[in-house]
């Protein structure tokens, strides 16, 4: 569309809208919202906005900001109260809430209060920790807030997009997300033609192709500039934009993160386990043990006992610990320069095994330099003149790297500002790969154009392209072989209207040096199981040369090979089975367009790789979205940042690797807790399920709640634990969580059952220690009570309890005319009462013992599951040790002092004479001194009395069984090959055997079928270097040879054999040769050893 046609079109609609314009103007600011700016002309738009093409003043902008508000949508933040209670609304919390309902229904106020308290504590910790982490991440993310270039006070300045107001004149260019609804202004210097700005509106309108926008057209907030740049006037901001009005009608999708699925599965398995044990326990207790269930307080101890499994087998803290670990980890990543825009991306980053990286700015410094002496002129101009035209081609306003290096490379650049002026500028875009500047020479009025860009594209536009093809392409290859990027420069007289042909001026070499840490970072990636593939738009030879410098491997292909292979060309995969195998095996691709990045990601994902892709441009957005982890590098465009999962604030590959390792540490902490919580919850369910079914043994719910508060609360410390990142990509494998967790749970269940069995069914502890007996076997109790009654009371154990004075006054059966005979109907004997009391007190002591052992042995599992090595050797974080110490100190104190009986029996006496015989001191019960009455054992609830010195037994017992957990872990890791455990050991073994075999072959004088100049490898010479097969002194005594000492930058030659001999011998003093020529004590490389020596009879001074 020509400028004239557009003017006529605007004129046609102008008359139709004149009344609307007038009406809106009369209504003041309200009219701005009502006017259809797409249909009115620029003059009317400026009138309504009360502004001009020169923008606004600072004071006016500030006043409008107060009037119209910030340029952002209202915060979609949820009510904090609803967020808080949301932590109590999930399947795990529902189970706890069901337990609370059962407790209150059974008039068990203490358990009800404790369960509700546990829910509140859990929700509070979740709310506070996640809120703090979220605020911290938002604060760090503020630096990534969208910016805009606005004309304020007559100068173009960069401001936060949120501060834009109607009437601002802004500059939008390629890669920008349009920050507000705008109307395009005329292109600078355009007359009868103009270059359209291409804007992607797919997110707003669904259009698949970018829309071409001309002067007077509107562009909506949220759309992306795909090509071109233009000044525009803002007419709507915030909620008044097209996007803002539509936002209320858009319902966002709820994506369930992988971590949520994992939590659901773990929670589901725990609920199934609970259900199984409830189905088993209830019939056994009611049918086999003949328990009753009546109304009233403590009237149904069977159901109260169900609460032990219901509360203990629910990992109530799991959502808290895992979400807090993820949030705090994301905050730490943000501080290290990697801001997470999608929380679940942390998990996916941990599983990354292929990273496709840009070359420029990521692997290299993106600090270009031009050496004028290496410039290759192809016309009549000399080099200074070529550099002048290069400077004139640059648009220094946008500060693009190539523009800036061209400008800075011309010494007299400041003079150009007063002698020349840009009248029009065609910006770079990934498709055309050129820029065109129309330049006016102020003194003469001469107009000419300067073109720069890809040398092949520039060459194709030259009028004599055929003649220049050979020398230009040869020079491009020469530059590429030296690691230089090439830039073509051309010029043409006139403004292009007369069809003047282009004349190519020169090819300029630009060098972008690798970052100092890139090579080391790539080596770290390889050690971490991440394959780094270079994806660059530069020439293939440049890519290979850079890859060679970085030690990446040089198996690279141009992108056209990939396209041919995918389109069915059987020869294109270069000998590989198919294009997928080629992409997997190669080290990268060159001459890549943005759409090729998408193809590369898609192919790698077809091969089941977890793919990361870096990008910075607007056309990189599809590939960034497609990748499992899209990484927007530092200084990326708004569009790239919007599409990325991770936004880097620091340049370079090292930040990405640091983020990957950090993500793996976060993942390690989450899997550590997952294994821990599986083992602990299963252990509680199986331990108390078995004890109840086999022995009809009860345990108070209060201790399980306290256990959850102490141990699960302490596990928050895992979110900050010191862990070693996995050397392999980490993904959720529930088998490696459930199976070890179940095995550890069974082992711990065995330990608890064994402790209970030894304590209550044997005399081991009373024989081996001065501690009181906990044996509750009926025969043992009868024998013990008979001896105690006879020796201490001097009465017949078979006499009625009425004959014992302290009980006679309490029993109605003993009062009145009843004779204190040896036998009273309905009154138990002294022996019966003693047995009942002893069973009661010993069970109460045993519960304190079992509780202490449960707590210590259960939480100690975390030290086993947090590392694949020896748990006592691998040091955990200080917070983990402190949390363990505090939790177990509390548990030990409960074990020592108990709860004063906790619950008194339903039928009782005021004293417990025979309890004292067992504990050696007075038993202090809850509220009052009470005891059970013989014959009512099945209707009293479980009490807890401090077991004193038995806590030492609990610790020792836990320690003994702990010693087997590491071997169990290693066996499981071997069987399941967890974290590549079996592969690593198999590799070490095969490598060891291979080296031994080669050593034996050498000793047996077998012929070595290896490369020329090599010998069989052995332990002293692992690389099989021939020079190491002879003594160093024999090598140095060859006087006819010149010794060449090699370093990284050059090879210095000594022609004096004696000098070389002394240097060599000096360097070897005190340096025993270890593998790879390293000092076996220090691990440092020798400056001169047999692996860095080459003999050359006639060597020049420098090579």
Curated annotation (Swiss-Prot):
Start and end residues of each stretch annotated as Disordered: 1-32, 1054-1103
Q: Polar residues: which segments have biased composition? A: 1078-1093
Reaction catalysed? Answer: ATP + H2O + H(+)(in) = ADP + phosphate + 2 H(+)(out)
Under the heading SMART domains, the entry gives: Cation_ATPase_N
Q: Which UniProt keywords apply?
A: ATP-binding, Cell membrane, Hydrogen ion transport, Ion transport, Magnesium, Membrane, Metal-binding, Nucleotide-binding, Phosphoprotein, Translocase, Transmembrane, Transmembrane helix, Transport
Q: Can you list the GO cellular component terms from the UniProt entry?
A: plasma membrane
Which compartments is it annotated to reside in? Cell membrane
Q: Classify the protein's membrane topology as the record does.
A: Multi-pass membrane protein
GO annotation, biological process: proton export across plasma membrane
Give the family per the record: Belongs to the cation transport ATPase (P-type) (TC 3.A.3) family. Type IIIA subfamily.
Name of this chain's protein: Plasma membrane ATPase
Organism of derivation: Dunaliella acidophila (Green alga)
């Amino acid at each position: 569309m020509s400028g004239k046609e557009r003017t006529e079109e605007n004129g046609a609609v102008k008359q139709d809208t004149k009344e609307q314009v007038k009406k809106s103007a009369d209504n003041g600011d309200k009219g701005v919202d009502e006017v259809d700016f797409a249909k009115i002309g620029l003059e009317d738009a400026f009138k309504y906005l009360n502004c001009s093409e020169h923008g606004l003043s600072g004071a006016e902008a500030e006043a409008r900001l107060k009037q119209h508000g910030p340029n952002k949508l209202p915060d979609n933040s949820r009510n904090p109260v609803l967020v808080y209670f949301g932590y109590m609304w999930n399947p795990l919390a529902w189970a706890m809430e069901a337990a609370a309902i059962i407790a209150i229904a059974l008039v068990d106020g203490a358990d009800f209060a404790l369960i509700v308290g546990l829910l509140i504590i859990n929700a509070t910790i979740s709310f506070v920790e996640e809120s703090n982490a979220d605020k911290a991440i938002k604060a760090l993310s503020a630096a990534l807030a969208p910016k805009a270039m606005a004309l304020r006070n007559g100068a173009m300045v960069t401001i936060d997009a949120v501060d834009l107001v109607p009437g601002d004149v802004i500059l939008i260019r390629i890669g920008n997300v349009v920050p507000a609804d705008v109307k395009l202004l005329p292109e600078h210097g355009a007359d009868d033609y103009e270059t359209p700005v291409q804007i992607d509106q797919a997110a707003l309108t669904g259009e698949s192709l970018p829309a071409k926008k001309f002067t007077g057209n509107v562009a909506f907030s949220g759309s992306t500039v795909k090509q071109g740049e233009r000044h525009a006037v803002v007419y709507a901001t915030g909620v008044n934009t097209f996007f803002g009005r539509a936002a209320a009608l858009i319902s966002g999708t709820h994506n369930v993160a992988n971590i949520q699925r994992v939590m659901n599965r773990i929670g589901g398995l725990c609920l199934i386990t609970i259900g199984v044990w409830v189905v088993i326990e209830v019939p056994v207790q009611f049918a086999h043990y003949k328990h009753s269930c009546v109304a009233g307080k403590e009237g149904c101890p069977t159901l109260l006992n169900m609460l032990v499994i219901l509360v203990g087998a629910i990992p109530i803290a799991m959502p808290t610990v895992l979400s807090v670990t993820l949030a705090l980890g994301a905050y730490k990543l943000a501080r290290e320069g990697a801001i997470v825009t999608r929380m679940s991306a942390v998990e996916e980053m941990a599983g990354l095994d292929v990273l496709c990286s840009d070359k420029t700015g990521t692997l290299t410094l993106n600090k270009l330099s031009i050496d004028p002496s290496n410039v290759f002129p192809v016309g009549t101009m000399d080099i200074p003149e070529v550099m002048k035209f290069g400077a004139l081609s640059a648009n220094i306003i946008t500060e693009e790297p190539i523009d800036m290096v061209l400008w800075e490379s011309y010494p007299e650049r400041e003079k150009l500002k007063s002698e020349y002026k840009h009248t029009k500028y065609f910006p770079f875009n990934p498709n055309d790969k050129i820029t065109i500047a129309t330049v006016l020479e102020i003194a003469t009025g001469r107009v000419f154009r300067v073109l720069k860009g890809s040398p092949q594209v520039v060459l194709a536009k030259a009028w004599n392209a055929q003649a220049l093809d050979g020398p230009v392409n040869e020079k491009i290859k020469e530059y590429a072989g030296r690691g230089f990027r090439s830039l073509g420069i051309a010029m043409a007289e006139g403004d292009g209207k007369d069809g003047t042909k282009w004349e190519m001026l020169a090819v300029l070499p630009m060098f972008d040096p690798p970052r100092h840490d890139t090579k080391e970072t790539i080596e770290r990636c390889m050690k971490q199981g991440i394959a780094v593939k270079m994806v660059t738009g530069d020439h293939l030879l440049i890519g290979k040369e850079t890859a060679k410098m970085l030690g990446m491997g040089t198996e690279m292909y141009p992108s056209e090979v990939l396209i041919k292979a995918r389109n069915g060309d059987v020869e294109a995969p270069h000998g590989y089975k198919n294009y997928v195998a080629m992409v997997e095996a190669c080290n990268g691709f060159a001459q890549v367009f943005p759409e090729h990045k998408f193809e590369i990601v898609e192919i790698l994902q077809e091969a089941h790789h977890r793919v990361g892709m870096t990008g910075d441009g607007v056309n990189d957005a599809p590939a960034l979205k497609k990748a499992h982890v899209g990484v927007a590098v530092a200084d990326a465009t708004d569009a790239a940042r919007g599409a990325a999962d991770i936004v880097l604030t620091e340049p370079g590959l090292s930040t990405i690797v640091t983020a990957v390792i950090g993500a793996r540490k976060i993942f390690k902490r989450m899997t550590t807790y997952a294994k821990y919580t599986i083992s602990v919850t299963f252990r509680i369910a199986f331990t108390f399920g078995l004890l109840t079914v086999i022995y009809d043994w009860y345990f108070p719910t209060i201790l399980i709640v306290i256990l959850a508060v102490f141990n699960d609360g302490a596990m928050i410390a895992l979110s900050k634990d010191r862990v070693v990142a996995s050397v392999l990509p980490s993904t959720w494998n529930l088998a490696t969580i459930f199976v070890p967790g179940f095995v550890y749970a069974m082992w711990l269940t065995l330990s608890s059952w064994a402790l209970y069995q030894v304590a209550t069914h044997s005399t081991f502890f009373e024989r081996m220690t001065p501690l009181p007996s906990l044996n509750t076997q009926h025969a043992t109790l009868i024998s013990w009570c008979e001896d105690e009654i006879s020796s201490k009371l001097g009465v017949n154990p078979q006499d009625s309890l009425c004959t014992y004075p302290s009980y006679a006054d309490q029993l109605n059966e003993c009062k009145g005319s009843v004779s204190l005979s040896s036998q009273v109907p309905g009154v138990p004997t002294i022996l019966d009462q003693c047995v009942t009391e002893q069973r009661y007190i010993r069970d109460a002591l045993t519960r304190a013992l079992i509780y202490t052992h449960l707590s210590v042995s259960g939480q100690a599992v975390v030290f086993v599951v947090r590392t694949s090595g020896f748990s006592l050797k691998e040091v955990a974080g200080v917070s983990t040790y402190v949390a363990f110490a505090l939790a177990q100190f509390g548990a030990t104190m409960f074990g020592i002092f108990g709860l004063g009986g906790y619950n008194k029996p339903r039928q009782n006496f005021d004293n417990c004479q025979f309890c004292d015989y067992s504990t050696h001191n007075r038993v202090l019960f809850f509220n009052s001194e009470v005891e059970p009455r013989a014959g009512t054992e099945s209707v009293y609830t479980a009490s807890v009395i401090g077991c004193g010195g038995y806590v030492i037994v609990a610790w020792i017992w836990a320690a003994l069984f702990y010693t087997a957990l590491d071997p169990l872990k290693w066996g499981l890791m071997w069987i399941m090959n967890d974290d590549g455990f079996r592969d690593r050991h198999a590799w070490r073994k095969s490598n060891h055997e291979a080296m031994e075999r080669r050593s034996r072959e050498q000793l047996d004088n077998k012929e070595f079928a290896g490369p020329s100049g090599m010998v069989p490898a052995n332990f002293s010479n692992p690389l099989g270097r021939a020079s190491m097969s002879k003594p160093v002194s024999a090598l140095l005594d060859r006087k006819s040879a010149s010794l060449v000492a090699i370093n990284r930058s050059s090879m210095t030659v000594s022609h004096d054999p004696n000098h070389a001999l002394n240097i060599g011998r000096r360097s070897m003093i005190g340096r025993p040769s270890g593998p790879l020529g390293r000092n076996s004590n220090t691990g440092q490389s020798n400056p001169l050893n047999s692996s860095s020596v080459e003999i050359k009879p006639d060597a020049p001074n420098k090579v």
